[in-house]
Amino acid sequence: MKDKFGREIRSLRISITNKCNLQCFYCHREGHDSNNDRYMTPEEIGIIAKTSTKFGVKKIKISGGEPLLRKDVCEIIENIKDERIKDISLTTNGILLENLAEKLKDAGLNRVNVSLDTLNPELYKKITKFGDVERVINGIKKAIDVSLTPLKVNFLAMSINIKDLPDIMEFCRDIGAILQIIEFIPLKEELKGYYYNISPIENEIKEKADKVITRNFMQNRKKYIVDGLEIEFVRPMDNSEFCMHCTRIRLTYDGYLKPCLLRDDNLVDVLTPLRKGENLEPYFIECINRREPYFKIK
């Protein structure tokens, strides 16, 4: 199904918890700032995910909070699995990944994205408050060992860690990971000092690239191949191109369909009708009809 701007729906991002075992100073809680204790069960998540396939969803991304904190995360993956869903991935901070990687693979997970903003233990602890970067590195290596691949490393580019980017690039090249360089979105006034313009970096990478590929169903995002390393740039802010080609809807941990990453005022409650035994399709249609580009072409 297409929204009224002609954008097809191809993926669903499911937040399965609002809890996290780190306290990163920049965290925006998936754009849904709620302390609701209403959680979806694995079965409910499975029903919602499978309903989404009727509207064109073929890819599911599991996120949080930190999704690996849910002890039933493997059961959730098993409930999501469906022949119509071609790819199930999960975004994690990696702290718990080493011990869970094999179980996640056995449950049906295809691949993981791991957040890694620095390899420097002191800076990592400063960013996350009390995280151990060695656990993340070990988790990444274990995930690759059990074929949760292609593995992507998410690097959030900020003024305090941009100097570490070359080391992150070398690390990703050595282990065969894809690197995503993500633009920092300073949603609070006190965070604006951490903003870093990644446009010059993208231009530099583009000049060095051996090959450039356009991902047509991922906001027309460019993928650069540099000395064997795949690099992508994610720039949602003030980016009409990002919005124009967006094919994703979101499901919050407490059961609301979210038409837009950057809006929290047009959610559609899907968990309440599910628990009443209602058909969920009208709620998906309502969500899709509420979709519009946050940043429009000027």
Curated annotation (Swiss-Prot):
Its EC number is 4.1.99.22. SUPFAM superfamilies: Radical SAM enzymes. Keywords: 4Fe-4S, GTP-binding, Iron, Iron-sulfur, Lyase, Metal-binding, Molybdenum cofactor biosynthesis, Nucleotide-binding, S-adenosyl-L-methionine. The keyword Nuclease does not apply. One of its GO terms (molecular function) is S-adenosyl-L-methionine binding. The keyword Iron applies. Pathway: Cofactor biosynthesis; molybdopterin biosynthesis. GO terms for biological process: Mo-molybdopterin cofactor biosynthetic process. [4Fe-4S] cluster 1 binds at residues 20, 24, 27. GTP binds at residues 13, 61, 91, 152, 248-250. Its cofactor is [4Fe-4S] cluster. Pfam families: Fer4_12 (PF13353), Mob_synth_C (PF06463), Radical_SAM (PF04055). InterPro entries: Aldolase_TIM (IPR013785), EF_Hand_1_Ca_BS (IPR018247), Elp3/MiaA/NifB-like_rSAM (IPR006638), MoaA_arc (IPR013485), MoaA_NifB_PqqE_Fe-S-bd_CS (IPR000385), MoaA_twitch (IPR010505), MoCo_biosynth_MoaA/MoaC (IPR050105), rSAM (IPR007197). Binds 2 [4Fe-4S] clusters. Binds 1 [4Fe-4S] cluster coordinated with 3 cysteines and an exchangeable S-adenosyl-L-methionine and 1 [4Fe-4S] cluster coordinated with 3 cysteines and the GTP-derived substrate. It comes from the Archaea. Residues 4-230 form the Radical SAM core domain. S-adenosyl-L-methionine binds at residues 26, 65, 115. It catalyses: GTP + AH2 + S-adenosyl-L-methionine = (8S)-3',8-cyclo-7,8-dihydroguanosine 5'-triphosphate + 5'-deoxyadenosine + L-methionine + A + H(+). [4Fe-4S] cluster 2 binds at residues 243, 246, 260. Belongs to the radical SAM superfamily. MoaA family. Catalyzes the cyclization of GTP to (8S)-3',8-cyclo-7,8-dihydroguanosine 5'-triphosphate. NCBIfam families: moaA_archaeal, PRK00164.2-1. This is Probable GTP 3',8-cyclase. It comes from Methanocaldococcus jannaschii (strain ATCC 43067 / DSM 2661 / JAL-1 / JCM 10045 / NBRC 100440). The lineage of its organism: Archaea, Methanobacteriati, Methanobacteriota, Methanomada group, Methanococci. The gene is moaA.
